[in-house]
Amino acid sequence: MTAIIILNWNGADDTLACLNSLANAEGEFVVYVVDNGSADDSVLRIQSWIDGHNEVDVQLVPLDRNYGFAKGNNKGLEVAARMSPDSYLLLNNDTEVLPDFLVRLQEFSVSHPEYRVLAPKINYFYDKNKIWNCGGKLAFGFRKYYYAGSPDSAVKENGHIDISFVTGCALFFYPELLDEHGHLLTERFFFGEEDFEFSMRMKKARVPMACVLDSLIYHKVGASGNKMHHSGKVFLHYLNRFIDVRLHNSTLFYVSWTVLNAPLCFRHFYKMCRTVSGSFKLMNRLFFDARKKDAVTREDFEALVIRNDYFKKK
């Protein structure tokens, strides 16, 4: 049996669409919808859906506040662990699945037990013949998606491909990967970066991972991110990544990686502020904060992408 964890935050429309697709899914599973302190009517709407659908086992786990993506999922895993499932699946609420997506993953996990982390092929929801990714690879602190933006016909392999990066959008794994607290994801980052950090840990530990190509889901890419202030979202991404790479590698590696990343950062910052001096100020702030911080907190997140007052603080 697979325990599926779905995190909801003010996103009942997407979550209910995801549940409707899971109601037709094959295989043995139970769904835990973790409401991450929604301020709207999400809890009432999701509970109403559960009460009216007996064909699928769905349990609602309401949290008292927004704990962020990683901690919210970890809290869901704590609850699901009480059922001692054979496997877990983290699934974004802005996805919709094909009926056989889960059983394809389950069957592959039985026939290829050496792979301890699996991912389905993920296509765009609004362009269903276009691939978002088939996992990816990590190299020198960089991530590259496999088949990103390619048509379905571009995938020639049968069965699976080995990967070293897996997105948190759909992450199938075995219980032994949970830590002593029953958690999977780092809680250093309130929003974002958790899948990159997880993939770095798995690569270091030599944990085999694969994308199962005949398992398919659709993703409404960026649904939660659409609510964020754009410039803050860009800075948040780089701050998360710089801290993550620094903490996982030597000083020499981090400095070399920073030099390689600097032109890309500058280009993105220049698109945001349209001045050279403003771009350099953002670069300097990024480098300073990435050296001083070991985590990106909820306060940092809200200052960057909600209130847009992060740069008013020293």
Question: Which stretches of residues belong to each language-model region?
Answer:
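A conserved acidic beta->alpha catalytic loop
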Residues: 12, 21, 35-46, 65, ...
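Short, acidic, metal-binding catalytic loop of nucleotide-sugar glycosyltransferases
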Residues: 20-29
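Acidic/His-rich active-site region of diverse nucleotide-sugar glycosyltransferases
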Residues: 62, 71, 96-183, 188
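Glycine-rich, basic loop-to-helix element that forms the pyrophosphate-binding segment
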Residues: 62-83
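Short beta-strand-to-loop acidic/aromatic patch adjacent to the donor-nucleotide binding site
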Residues: 84-96
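Acidic donor-binding loop at a coil-to-helix junction in glycosyltransferase catalytic cores
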Residues: 166, 191-197, 233
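Catalytic donor-sugar/metal-binding loop of nucleotide-sugar-dependent glycosyltransferases
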Residues: 183, 187-190, 196-218
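Non-catalytic, C-terminal membrane-associated alpha-helical segments of glycosyltransferases
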Residues: 232-240, 250-314
